[in-house]
A protein has these predicted regions:
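Generic short alpha-helical hydrophobic face used as a protein-protein interaction/packing hotspot
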Residues: 26, 67, 156, 222, ...
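Cys/His-clustered metal-coordination modules, chiefly Zn-binding fingers
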Residues: 174-251
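Hydrophobic, aromatic-lined core segments that form the binding pocket/scaffold
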Residues: 39, 47-209
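Generic structural motif recognizing short loop/turn segments at the entrances and edges of beta-strands
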Residues: 5, 9-13, 23, 80-87, ...
Length: 251
């Protein structure tokens, strides 16, 4: 992995090596229920969340951005990825991703067919990293799995939308569409689950423009109000329903 790639990941996804930004908590520690509870209680105060469920949802969005978005971006743009195992990952005090020394490696497609390489990379990502993290967040906070997995899907939609808006090279657009279709149509085996937990939430292109709203609410609006009042996400289903109700009243 050259320095240009690492600088891109640092700039776009807040990914740092351990010597650049020390860790606050290793993700392996977060998988311990007692330590996870302690961390969520601290994080809840940091972001001014009213309860553990809101804190867990916000943390899942952040972690998906750091790990999932960066991986999918790398697959499209660089045709390679950082091998982000649970053991390699930690969060800094600033809630950026700290990659621990000696526990990561860059993986190119190399001699493998890209489809075979992609399946191995994404199975490792979702089944051994994302799924365990979401499971412990659910267990500790009782936030529904559907919210957590849609948080992941929203990050996927977002990173692909941004690449399509900026990246015009046909080979990369082809990779993106292929990767999206693979994720959309993957079986539950990719996630070590009975069913694909994100397929109903994935959207790109015209479908995303026509129907941008989420199916579940990430609970962001429950964070402490700022000077502008309650803050809803742009794709918030609650905000959308309120708008529809007002429009019906005006008719």
């Amino acid at each position: 992995m050259n320095s240009n790639v690492m600088n891109k990941l640092k700039t776009n996804f807040d990914i740092y090596l351990e010597h650049e930004m020390p860790k606050d908590i290793a993700i392996t520690d977060l998988l311990d229920e007692e330590k996870c509870l302690s961390f969520l209680q601290k994080y809840m105060q940091e972001i001014k969340a009213p309860n553990l469920s809101v804190a867990a949802s916000m943390l899942s969005k952040r972690y998906a951005y750091l790990v999932v978005s960066s991986t999918l971006y790398s697959m499209v743009v660089f045709n390679g990825v950082l091998n982000l195992s649970v053991k390699a990952c930690a969060l800094t005090k600033e809630r950026k991703l700290c990659i621990q020394a000696g526990m990561y490696k860059w993986q190119d497609v190399k001699s493998l067919e890209r489809e075979e390489w992609r399946e191995k990379v994404l199975h490792h990502l979702f089944s051994t990293n994302i799924k365990p993290v979401l499971n412990i967040l659910k267990k500790t906070s009782h936030v529904p799995s559907s919210i957590l997995w849609e948080n992941v899907a929203i990050r996927i939609n977002s990173v692909y939308r941004k690449i399509l808006a900026e990246e015009l090279e046909p080979v990369k657009i082809k990779r993106l569409n292929s990767d999206f279709n693979f994720l959309k149509n993957a079986s539950g085996d990719l996630f070590n689950l009975k069913e694909n937990p994100i397929k109903h939430y994935l959207k790109i292109g015209e479908e995303l423009k026509l129907n941008p709203c989420r199916q579940t609410c990430c609970l962001n609006y429950k964070l402490e109000e700022n000077a502008k009042g309650i803050v809803y996400c742009n794709n918030c289903p609650i905000k959308s329903n309120q708008t529809k109700a007002r429009n019906q009243c005006d008719e």
